[in-house]
């Protein structure tokens, strides 16, 4: 079901989970965002499979994720080389990751990565930005049991 403009529709995307920001220097970015947001990061975590160290800030119901590459050829390093530091992805929380992937693939959207384990106790998948108005969209769900 595709809602019309002006209609209220509480669909499968539960909320904006976080904004992912690619940074060249995690320590400096943490200092800046601690000043700007008025809170310290609640978690720093390395995701070896992705070649990245993440740092999370809680901002109300949503989060900010800072991402620094641990390898010169990792996805975040390539992103910074091509586009510079800044917004990397927008993540939406879903209840059923595999179900949402199936629904979106059925509508012609391409998954370029996942489903797989990600940071902050989540299972994640990414949609191809060519299909999503040039925005890298992450779907994430809480890891189950």
Summary of predicted features, one role per range:
Residues 5-10, 55-58, 65, 92, ...:
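Vicinal oxygen chelate
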Residues 25-40, 104-107:
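Amphipathic alpha-helical segments
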Residues 40-60:
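Acidic (E/D-rich), amphipathic helical modules within compact regulatory domains
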């Amino acid at each position: 079901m595709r809602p019309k403009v002006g209609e209220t529709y509480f669909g499968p995307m539960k909320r904006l989970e976080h904004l992912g920001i690619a940074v060249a220097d995690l320590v400096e970015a943490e200092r800046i965002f601690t000043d700007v947001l008025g809170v310290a990061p609640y978690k720093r975590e390395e995701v070896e499979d992705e070649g990245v160290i993440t740092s999370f800030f809680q901002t109300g119901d949503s989060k900010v994720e800072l991402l620094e590459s641990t390898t010169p050829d990792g996805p975040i390093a390539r992103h910074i080389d091509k586009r510079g530091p800044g917004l990397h992805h927008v993540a939406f929380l879903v209840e059923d990751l595999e179900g949402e992937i199936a629904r979106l693939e059925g509508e012609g959207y391409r998954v370029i990565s996942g489903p797989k384990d990600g940071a902050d106790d989540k299972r994640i998948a990414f949609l191809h930005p060519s299909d999503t108005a040039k925005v890298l969209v992450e779907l994430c769900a809480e890891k189950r049991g």
